[in-house]
Amino acid sequence: LKPGDVLGLVGELGSGKTTLIQGLADGLGLDASAVRSPTFIVLREYPGRVPLIHIDGYRLEGAPSVVWLDVDWVFSSKKVTVIEWANQIEDCLPDDYLELQLSHKSVNQRLIRMIAHGARSRELVAGIGGVVHSPQSTVHKRAGQES
């Protein structure tokens, strides 16, 4: 990931959205243990070499509820932005973002479906194919946009 990337996470409660964001924070060199669900404050920023913005879209429930967010700041090219429950604020998302749909495969396994919305997101999906190392993990490409 690099500054300006936006990830939209979708999945039921307990599907691993916050845990995934903790892993992303660790990969960005941030303190992953500091990452918590932003449920009661809606947005958290984790400063670092590449700052991470973590938004909870669940409580925002649609575009009218997010007009108070400074969208230019949130989706700044100087930050990585990750939105839990991104489907709740789809109308506010930028044109280019990577949607990650999380679901339970088993008690300790998750299935992540990636849908690219834009050129940069397609680059991210293509790059992930080369870094998936788990023998249980697979990356499937469909229609040049979904994985």
What are these regions (language model features)?
Residues 1-4:
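Phosphate-binding P-loop
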Residues 9:
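Hydrophobic anchor at the beta1->P-loop junction of P-loop NTPases
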Residues 13:
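The conserved Walker
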Residues 17:
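Conserved lysine of the Walker
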Residues 30-45:
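Short beta-strand-centered segment that lines the nucleotide-binding/catalytic pocket of NTP-utilizing
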Residues 54-61:
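Switch II (G3) loop of P-loop NTPases
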Residues 66-67, 72-147:
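Short phosphate-coordinating micro-motif centered on Lys-Gly-acidic
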